[in-house]
A protein has these predicted regions:
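Amphipathic alpha-helical interaction segments
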Residues: 75, 79, 100-103, 107, ...
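Oxyanion-binding "anion nests"
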Residues: 66-120
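Internal helical hairpin/lid segments
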Residues: 107-154, 159
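C-terminal charged capping/lid subdomain of soluble metabolic enzymes
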Residues: 39, 45-48, 143-189
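A glycine/threonine-rich phosphate-anchoring loop and its flanking beta-alpha core
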Residues: 1-67
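Flexible, glycine/charged-enriched surface loops at secondary-structure junctions
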Residues: 58-59, 72, 93-101, 121-124, ...
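Short alpha-helical scaffolding segments that buttress acidic/His motifs in well-ordered protein cores
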Residues: 44-48, 76-84, 131, 156, ...
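A short glycine-threonine-serine/GTX helix/turn-capping micro-motif
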Residues: 14, 33-34, 45-46, 96-99, ...
């Protein structure tokens, strides 16, 4: 879950939402069991992302969870929020590059999301697809081992996050959306 109300009000995106700036963040883990399964799973894309970029031991905890139970331990939620807050705190003005870690899967995911017809793809589903693409690129260009990539893909599959785009979208439209992203420069993400 990305933030306090964000898990429930995904359509009400708050410009400039920043967990570090909040005076109080209230989290009710019991509310998760009231969500439709698909919405619960798509919120997991953010938890998965934070574990992948900053807390590999958390991946073991996530592998042990049963997605059908729709329960996440409060300490896991707190640790997840802390990861995001620490990254933002380290690079509040986005000048060091550290904060770019939070974009893992988002650049390509947002391009897919903006190309799809509104309502056909949940935000977390698009991010999951973007993460898969980022894992592929990280294996090819950044030294991520195939074993690490496979582990992360298995976890996405365990949580029933999409790994394959089952919509017919134009590659040209996705590339056009990608080119509009601020993180895309000189033809690279």
């Amino acid at each position: 879950a990305e933030g306090n109300l964000d898990v429930i009000l995904r359509s009400e995106r708050f410009a400039g939402h920043d967990p570090l700036k909040a005076r109080l963040v209230l989290v009710d883990p019991e509310a998760l069991i009231t969500l439709p399964a698909k919405v619960f799973r798509e919120g997991f894309a953010e938890i998965f992302k934070h574990a992948a970029i900053r807390d590999r031991p958390m991946l073991t905890d996530l592998e042990a969870l049963d997605p059908t139970q729709q329960r996440v331990a409060p300490d896991l939620i707190a640790a997840n929020l802390s990861i995001k807050a620490r990254i933002v705190e380290e690079d509040e003005k986005e000048t060091l590059g550290t904060r770019a870690l939070l974009n893992f899967g988002h650049t390509i995911g947002h391009a897919i999301e903006s190309t799809a017809e509104y309502g056909t793809l949940l935000h977390g589903e698009a991010i999951s697809l973007g993460i898969r693409a980022a894992l592929y690129l990280s294996t090819k260009k950044c030294g991520l081992t195939p074993e690490e990539s496979s582990r992360l893909l298995r976890l996405q599959e365990q949580w029933q996050l999409p790994l394959v785009l089952d919509l017919e979208l134009s590659t040209n439209d996705i590339m056009t959306a990608l080119a509009r992203d601020k993180k895309f420069s000189a033809g690279e993400v």
